[in-house]
């Protein structure tokens, strides 16, 4: 799973990670060197039980990622092993976020064959997973006001290119 901000993995893919933690490496591409967010991300990984993760910082905001540097680093990760699924933001950036859209476009260019995206599900996630996901989101104390805007009840992954 490759996302644009610490908390995106929990917000948009928390149920997936909580039920399939052994299948994922999580990479966060962050524009800031924010120690609080870094610690929250590490706490999120520990809460979920993810052993493989990377938090990259210093990437310019907006749609203007330093694309050459980012593509180089993404290719390094993608070549580590034979991945069968890459999960990231959807083409619309969930709520229109330019960094989410840009990351989707880059990954769709690099590995369209195995790309999956976050989508809103119509089926509510189970109460057992919902309780865990809510507890997971509490790890991101610095983002509480932002996270309150989103509904944690529905979550779905969708293959990008069928």
Where are these regions (language model features)?
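The feature marks non-catalytic terminal segments
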Residues: 85, 113-162
